[in-house]
């Protein structure tokens, strides 16, 4: 029953993003999840207690503001936990994973309790104070990404360096773009790419755990002018069209395109360095 509730909440949250110009950002009434910039931001508000007349009125006002700020921050933390639970990890929500593993749940709750303040405190017209808190997805990934199944750190650079260095700079491929603008794809922290024969083209075994945590396997953007494109895949990426996204999280490309990516990986180490980006609607 719990899993059904989480799935429903995740579905409702994604509805906020469907018509948004930035569908890599899932917005709710309590904040947003930004898969492109790998950050989760929550917001909390609280009423400012009316000023009381007193000989020491100034100190009373300071005390009241302090209480209101504390209440707003507490609400923002509660909202943050709710947002974290609907983050799409790999087709599973973080909340589903927490429900299955009490240790993971405790670690994530600790992470949420250490969320940092995002921006300045806002003082609203209706006598309210608002505070935003943020958690980086790298912190969430540190907890959720398994230690096993990834490329060994020691061999992650050795296989392609000679080939890349012997290729003229003008001919080097700098990254891979998967164009998913014609299909429905839900962003995730660790999605995979398969070909039409259901063979894995890109997944944890292609990159190290540290890169998965710190960089994320894939970037997201909505057009080629987005600054994330240059930062993630450089100036000369190859562009591959996604065929489908049957489970809405993992992407499928053609067999021919999967061979092109494998060849580019052997020569330039694009997958090893997580130089992969998905274009969304």
Question: What are these regions, as identified by a protein language model?
Answer:
Residues 1-5:
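Positively charged n-region of N-terminal signal peptides that target proteins for export
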Residues 9-17:
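Hydrophobic h-region of N-terminal signal peptides that target proteins for export
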Residues 17-281:
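Domain-level marker for long, solvent-exposed, non-transmembrane regions
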């Amino acid at each position: 029953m719990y899993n059904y509730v989480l799935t429903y909440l995740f579905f409702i949250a994604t509805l906020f993003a469907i018509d948004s110009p930035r569908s890599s950002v899932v917005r709710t009434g309590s904040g947003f999840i930004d898969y492109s910039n790998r950050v989760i931001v929550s917001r909390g508000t609280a009423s400012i207690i009316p000023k009381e007349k007193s000989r020491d009125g100034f100190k009373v006002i300071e005390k009241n503001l302090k209480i209101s700020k504390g209440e707003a921050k507490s609400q923002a933390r509660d909202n943050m936990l709710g947002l974290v639970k609907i983050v799409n990890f790999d087709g599973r929500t973080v909340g589903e994973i927490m429900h299955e593993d009490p240790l993971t749940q405790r670690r994530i709750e600790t992470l949420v309790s250490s969320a940092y303040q995002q921006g300045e405190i806002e003082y609203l017209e209706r006598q309210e104070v608002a505070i935003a808190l943020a958690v980086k997805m790298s912190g969430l990934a540190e907890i959720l990404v398994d230690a096993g199944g990834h490329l060994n750190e020691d061999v992650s650079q050795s296989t392609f360096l000679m080939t890349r260095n012997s290729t003229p700079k003008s001919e080097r491929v700098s990254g891979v773009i998967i164009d998913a603008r014609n299909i429905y794809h839900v962003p995730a922290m660790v999605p995979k790419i398969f070909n039409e024969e259901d063979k894995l083209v890109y997944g944890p075994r292609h990159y190290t755990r540290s890169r998965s945590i710190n960089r994320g396997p894939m970037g997201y953007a909505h057009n080629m002018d987005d600054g994330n494109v240059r930062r993630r895949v450089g100036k000369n990426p190859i562009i591959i069209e996604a065929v489908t996204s049957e489970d809405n999280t993992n992407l499928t490309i053609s067999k021919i395109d999967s061979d092109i990516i494998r060849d580019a990986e052997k020569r330039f180490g694009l997958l090893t360095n997580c130089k992969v980006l998905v274009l969304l609607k």
